[in-house]
Amino acid sequence: MSVVGIVPAAGAGERLGADVPKAFAVLGGRPMVEWSLDVLREVCDRVVVAVPPDRVQPPDFVAGGATRSESVRNALAAAPEASIVVVHDAARPLVTVELARRCLDALEDSYDGVIAAIPVTDTVKEVEHGDVVGTPDRGRLWAAQTPQVFRADALRSAAGEATDDASLVEKMGGRVRVIEGMRENFKITTPLDARVAEMLLAD
């Protein structure tokens, strides 16, 4: 069984305001993506990173796509040996080896995937054209994180575009399990997020 990590790291990250692609913005004295690579290399046999064209370094740094889903597909195509895939966002540098291992350990025979997620604590509103049209039951809502672990064949069979890979596996009828993630494993999107992450990484 070959476990391959995939890191989509081709996004520009305009909201972060950096002058380099977000995954390569300096965080805690090193490119942001390196924090995640350290973790994935502890639990995977190989890690493939989907990067902007000017950062391609075969075989493990491959060209990303115009979308996150396309970047994941490109990275997966570069790892035909994969039987299990661990997808992780470069913008979640506070992930831990323990969380990644829990995701892998939870992939039982009856599941196609396992994702880290956290229960939603705020009340969520459905809004159309500025009007509230519904209030979902908060008790059933979880905010998806990464790592997301899949049987490679299930992910290869999934098609389309989505903001997370589990959505694509779900659409093809795959069974996806949730394990509780970490509040600290937030996604860095804004300069404020980066400042908070810097403080946590310094602890």
Language-model region placement:
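N-terminal glycine-rich phosphate-binding loop and ensuing alpha1 helix
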Residues: 1-53, 59
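Short phosphate-binding loop-to-helix
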Residues: 57-85
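Acidic metal-phosphate-binding loop of nucleotide-sugar-dependent transferases
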Residues: 68, 90-94
